[in-house]
Amino acid sequence: MDAALLLNVEGVKKTILHGGTGELPNFITGSRVIFHFRTMKCDEERTVIDDSRQVDQPMHIIIGNMFKLEVWEILLTSMRVHEVAEFWCDTIHTGVYPILSRSLRQMAQGKDPTEWHVHTCGLANMFAYHTLGYEDLDELQKEPQPLIFVIELLQVDAPSDYQRETWNLSNHEKMKVVPVLHGEGNRLFKLGRYEEASSKYQEAIICLRNLQTKEKPWEVQWLKLEKMINTLTLNYCQCLLKKEEYYEVLEHTSDILRHHPGIVKAYYVRARAHAEVWNEAEAKADLQKVLELEPSMQKAVRRELRLLENRMAEKQEEERLRCRNMLSQGATQPPAEPPAQPPTAPPAELSTGPPADPPAEPPTAPPAELSTGPPAEPPAELPLSPGHSLQH
């Protein structure tokens, strides 16, 4: 089948190269569309810009998810499964293609850890770059032009037919999934599966951060999301404590307290992290702050102070033993032996011929004076500072 068709869209022309099968799919919001594509210029050579088959990885987009190149959703929803079609698109539809292409190329080269899909995250920031890092894309960005897209529709999945990633969810769906992820994280934490629990908390935080970008900072809805984010972040930090990643805990809790200095749990969690890395003064200061803000936590604070005292005593004893061992090793080390003397050359054989004129003797350097003092001892090593030791 080879027919030229005009879609009911300005600046788009469709030519079917190979007919599809079945009826037109039901492209509802949330449907996943999987396809191969080839992008070409409209010059005589039909210069290829991108081809998904070259990386052996189909493209996929989610219908209704604000894809970067909006015209592609229009093109795909006009196709049947296994159909191959060529679309000519005018400049009004192709202006952002260089930005999309840059993302796709970087992903194909392994520079992006996600799969080969693209959605509208940080699109506006992309315009701040003076160069896209590819000469052909820089040229397209400077002088937008019509492009040809050859698309083969491979598969259409309903929203219920695949596991949707959180970035694919609508705002309403993200708000609904956050408490589910939160509860699952708590369940996994109680089972001691801290790595899995931390992943659930992280996923929920990402959902909330995405929603928060759409609100005006410090207004009611933004603050509501911020409170939820802080709660999940502190749960995440408790997973990190279990995994002995103390410095990351210090980073997250300090960031929370910079913006919200009244959160008691943040001081408490940070105090525990300080104690684990022998920051005694900082741990005590945070525990004191906990008591000031929440006197009812006196019992828990006393317990942490006892643990801190025991930890510091163990550390001091460990360092005392280390220093004593170094001193004893230095005292028992034998003095260095003097260097061996070089072997003397054998006497020259007597000649029976007429005596030759003796060669001129080179001037000899004076011998080095021997030191009469005792051998030097190696310098003693400095003990590790308790505040910077990495031992746990």
UniProtKB/Swiss-Prot annotation:
One of its GO terms (molecular function) is peptidyl-prolyl cis-trans isomerase activity. The keyword Cytoplasm applies. Residues 335-346, 355-366 have a biased composition (Pro residues). Residues 329-392 are annotated as: Disordered. The keyword Nucleus applies. Signal peptide: none annotated. Residues 53-145 form the PPIase FKBP-type domain. It is found in: Cytoplasm; Nucleus. It comes from the Eukaryota. Its main location: cytoplasm. GO terms for cellular component: cytoplasm; nucleus. Keywords: Cytoplasm, Nucleus, Repeat, TPR repeat. InterPro entries: AIP/AIPL1/TTC9, PPIase_AIP, PPIase_dom_sf, TPR-like_helical_dom_sf, TPR_rpt. TPR repeats lie at residues 178-211, 230-263, 264-297. Interacts with NUB1. PANTHER family: ARYL HYDROCARBON RECEPTOR INTERACTING PROTEIN RELATED (PTHR11242), ARYL-HYDROCARBON-INTERACTING PROTEIN-LIKE 1 (PTHR11242:SF2). May be important in protein trafficking and/or protein folding and stabilization. This is Aryl-hydrocarbon-interacting protein-like 1. It comes from Macaca mulatta. The gene is AIPL1.
